[in-house]
Amino acid sequence: MSAGGPQPGGNVIGLSVQSTDLASKRVEILREVISDLRRLAILTNVGNSYAVLETGAAQAAAHMLDLDVVALEIRRAEDIAPAFEALKGRAEALYVVNDPLINTSRIRINTFALVARLPTMHGLREPVEAGGLMSYGPNLSDLYRRAAEFVDKILRGANPGDIPVEQPTKFDLVINLTTAKALGLDVPPTLLARADEVIE
Protein backbone atom coordinates (compact mmCIF):
# COMPACT_ATOMS: atom_id res chain seq x y z
CA MET A 1 0.00 0.00 0.00
CA SER A 2 1.12 3.56 -0.70
CA ALA A 3 1.12 6.48 1.71
CA GLY A 4 0.83 8.85 -1.24
CA GLY A 5 2.84 12.00 -1.88
CA PRO A 6 6.24 12.52 -3.49
CA GLN A 7 7.82 9.47 -1.79
CA PRO A 8 4.89 7.15 -1.14
CA GLY A 9 6.74 3.95 -0.22
CA GLY A 10 5.00 0.57 -0.38
CA ASN A 11 4.13 -1.29 -3.55
CA VAL A 12 1.09 0.60 -4.83
CA ILE A 13 1.55 3.43 -7.32
CA GLY A 14 -0.74 5.43 -9.50
CA LEU A 15 -2.74 8.55 -10.10
CA SER A 16 -5.26 10.02 -7.72
CA VAL A 17 -8.52 11.38 -9.16
CA GLN A 18 -9.93 12.08 -5.70
CA SER A 19 -9.28 15.81 -5.75
CA THR A 20 -11.64 17.86 -3.62
CA ASP A 21 -9.98 20.98 -5.04
CA LEU A 22 -12.22 20.72 -8.11
CA ALA A 23 -15.42 21.22 -6.11
CA SER A 24 -15.14 25.01 -6.05
CA LYS A 25 -14.54 25.15 -9.81
CA ARG A 26 -17.62 23.00 -10.43
CA VAL A 27 -19.81 25.22 -8.26
CA GLU A 28 -18.45 28.34 -10.01
CA ILE A 29 -19.28 26.88 -13.44
CA LEU A 30 -22.84 26.07 -12.31
CA ARG A 31 -23.22 29.66 -11.13
CA GLU A 32 -21.93 30.86 -14.49
CA VAL A 33 -24.72 28.98 -16.28
CA ILE A 34 -27.40 29.92 -13.74
CA SER A 35 -26.56 33.50 -12.79
CA ASP A 36 -29.48 33.79 -10.35
CA LEU A 37 -28.69 30.50 -8.60
CA ARG A 38 -29.55 30.69 -4.90
CA ARG A 39 -30.19 27.11 -3.76
CA LEU A 40 -27.86 24.24 -4.65
CA ALA A 41 -28.63 20.60 -3.92
CA ILE A 42 -25.69 18.25 -3.41
CA LEU A 43 -26.27 14.54 -4.06
CA THR A 44 -23.83 12.35 -2.15
CA ASN A 45 -23.35 8.80 -0.94
CA VAL A 46 -22.79 9.24 2.79
CA GLY A 47 -21.44 5.68 2.97
CA ASN A 48 -18.34 6.72 0.98
CA SER A 49 -15.77 8.64 3.04
CA TYR A 50 -14.28 10.36 -0.02
CA ALA A 51 -17.74 11.44 -1.18
CA VAL A 52 -18.27 13.01 2.24
CA LEU A 53 -15.00 14.96 1.83
CA GLU A 54 -16.01 16.22 -1.62
CA THR A 55 -19.43 17.14 -0.25
CA GLY A 56 -17.78 19.29 2.41
CA ALA A 57 -15.65 21.02 -0.22
CA ALA A 58 -18.70 21.64 -2.42
CA GLN A 59 -20.67 23.02 0.53
CA ALA A 60 -17.82 25.37 1.43
CA ALA A 61 -17.61 26.57 -2.19
CA ALA A 62 -21.38 27.13 -2.29
CA HIS A 63 -21.29 29.14 0.92
CA MET A 64 -18.48 31.31 -0.50
CA LEU A 65 -20.96 32.26 -3.25
CA ASP A 66 -23.75 32.86 -0.72
CA LEU A 67 -25.70 29.82 -1.90
CA ASP A 68 -28.03 27.85 0.31
CA VAL A 69 -27.19 24.14 0.29
CA VAL A 70 -29.72 21.30 0.32
CA ALA A 71 -28.24 17.89 1.16
CA LEU A 72 -29.42 14.83 -0.77
CA GLU A 73 -27.92 11.91 1.14
CA ILE A 74 -28.12 8.33 -0.09
CA ARG A 75 -26.55 5.02 0.91
CA ARG A 76 -27.99 2.70 -1.75
CA ALA A 77 -29.65 2.94 -5.14
CA GLU A 78 -33.10 2.56 -3.57
CA ASP A 79 -32.60 5.90 -1.79
CA ILE A 80 -32.39 7.91 -5.02
CA ALA A 81 -36.10 8.21 -5.83
CA PRO A 82 -37.14 9.23 -2.29
CA ALA A 83 -34.28 11.76 -2.18
CA PHE A 84 -35.54 13.48 -5.33
CA GLU A 85 -39.11 13.34 -4.06
CA ALA A 86 -38.03 15.17 -0.89
CA LEU A 87 -36.10 17.73 -2.97
CA LYS A 88 -39.09 19.05 -4.96
CA GLY A 89 -39.02 22.83 -5.18
CA ARG A 90 -36.09 23.21 -2.80
CA ALA A 91 -33.19 23.74 -5.23
CA GLU A 92 -32.35 25.23 -8.63
CA ALA A 93 -29.35 23.07 -9.53
CA LEU A 94 -27.75 19.78 -8.54
CA TYR A 95 -24.10 19.06 -7.77
CA VAL A 96 -23.55 15.31 -8.16
CA VAL A 97 -20.65 14.03 -6.05
CA ASN A 98 -18.40 11.50 -7.77
CA ASP A 99 -19.01 8.02 -6.32
CA PRO A 100 -19.27 4.45 -7.72
CA LEU A 101 -22.89 4.00 -6.59
CA ILE A 102 -23.90 7.35 -8.03
CA ASN A 103 -21.98 6.76 -11.26
CA THR A 104 -23.68 3.42 -11.88
CA SER A 105 -27.04 5.12 -11.29
CA ARG A 106 -26.26 8.08 -13.57
CA ILE A 107 -29.10 7.50 -16.05
CA ARG A 108 -31.71 7.35 -13.26
CA ILE A 109 -30.23 10.39 -11.55
CA ASN A 110 -30.19 12.42 -14.76
CA THR A 111 -33.77 11.38 -15.53
CA PHE A 112 -34.97 12.49 -12.10
CA ALA A 113 -33.01 15.74 -12.44
CA LEU A 114 -34.51 16.48 -15.85
CA VAL A 115 -38.04 15.86 -14.59
CA ALA A 116 -37.29 18.17 -11.65
CA ARG A 117 -35.81 20.77 -14.06
CA LEU A 118 -32.46 20.67 -12.27
CA PRO A 119 -29.25 21.40 -14.19
CA THR A 120 -26.55 18.98 -13.05
CA MET A 121 -22.79 19.21 -12.54
CA HIS A 122 -20.80 15.97 -12.51
CA GLY A 123 -17.15 15.07 -11.98
CA LEU A 124 -16.80 12.73 -14.96
CA ARG A 125 -17.71 12.84 -18.66
CA GLU A 126 -19.80 9.64 -18.68
CA PRO A 127 -22.79 11.05 -16.76
CA VAL A 128 -22.97 13.94 -19.25
CA GLU A 129 -23.10 11.44 -22.11
CA ALA A 130 -25.98 9.87 -20.18
CA GLY A 131 -27.99 13.10 -20.09
CA GLY A 132 -26.34 15.24 -17.41
CA LEU A 133 -25.79 18.91 -18.19
CA MET A 134 -22.10 19.38 -17.46
CA SER A 135 -18.97 17.83 -16.02
CA TYR A 136 -15.62 19.21 -14.99
CA GLY A 137 -12.96 16.72 -14.07
CA PRO A 138 -9.80 14.82 -14.97
CA ASN A 139 -9.23 13.75 -18.56
CA LEU A 140 -9.31 9.96 -18.19
CA SER A 141 -7.47 9.32 -21.46
CA ASP A 142 -4.56 11.35 -20.12
CA LEU A 143 -4.66 9.40 -16.85
CA TYR A 144 -4.58 6.08 -18.71
CA ARG A 145 -1.58 7.26 -20.77
CA ARG A 146 0.27 8.30 -17.63
CA ALA A 147 -0.59 5.00 -15.93
CA ALA A 148 1.00 3.21 -18.89
CA GLU A 149 4.14 5.28 -18.29
CA PHE A 150 4.22 4.00 -14.69
CA VAL A 151 4.00 0.42 -15.92
CA ASP A 152 6.83 1.07 -18.36
CA LYS A 153 9.03 2.46 -15.55
CA ILE A 154 8.43 -0.62 -13.39
CA LEU A 155 9.11 -2.99 -16.27
CA ARG A 156 12.41 -1.15 -16.76
CA GLY A 157 13.34 -1.82 -13.13
CA ALA A 158 12.06 1.18 -11.16
CA ASN A 159 11.11 0.57 -7.52
CA PRO A 160 7.33 1.15 -7.15
CA GLY A 161 7.91 2.74 -3.73
CA ASP A 162 10.02 5.46 -5.34
CA ILE A 163 7.38 6.46 -7.90
CA PRO A 164 5.17 9.28 -6.57
CA VAL A 165 1.39 9.14 -6.61
CA GLU A 166 0.44 11.96 -8.95
CA GLN A 167 -2.56 14.24 -9.31
CA PRO A 168 -4.28 14.84 -12.67
CA THR A 169 -2.92 17.73 -14.70
CA LYS A 170 -5.44 17.84 -17.58
CA PHE A 171 -9.08 18.64 -16.91
CA ASP A 172 -12.06 18.67 -19.26
CA LEU A 173 -15.25 20.71 -19.28
CA VAL A 174 -18.01 18.81 -21.08
CA ILE A 175 -21.42 20.36 -21.83
CA ASN A 176 -24.53 18.58 -23.12
CA LEU A 177 -26.42 21.13 -25.22
CA THR A 178 -29.31 18.72 -25.80
CA THR A 179 -29.90 18.65 -22.06
CA ALA A 180 -29.48 22.43 -21.83
CA LYS A 181 -32.22 22.89 -24.45
CA ALA A 182 -34.49 20.42 -22.66
CA LEU A 183 -34.04 22.48 -19.48
CA GLY A 184 -34.60 25.76 -21.33
CA LEU A 185 -31.10 26.96 -20.46
CA ASP A 186 -28.96 29.26 -22.56
CA VAL A 187 -25.35 28.30 -21.94
CA PRO A 188 -23.19 31.45 -22.14
CA PRO A 189 -21.11 31.56 -25.35
CA THR A 190 -18.01 32.30 -23.26
CA LEU A 191 -18.49 29.00 -21.40
CA LEU A 192 -19.14 27.08 -24.62
CA ALA A 193 -15.90 28.51 -26.01
CA ARG A 194 -14.01 27.12 -23.00
CA ALA A 195 -15.61 23.67 -23.23
CA ASP A 196 -13.36 20.79 -24.26
CA GLU A 197 -16.37 18.93 -25.63
CA VAL A 198 -19.93 19.95 -26.49
CA ILE A 199 -22.48 17.16 -26.91
CA GLU A 200 -25.32 18.04 -29.30
Please place each PLM-identified region on the residue numbering.
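Short hydrophobic alpha-helices and adjacent helix-cap/hinge residues
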Residues: M1-E200
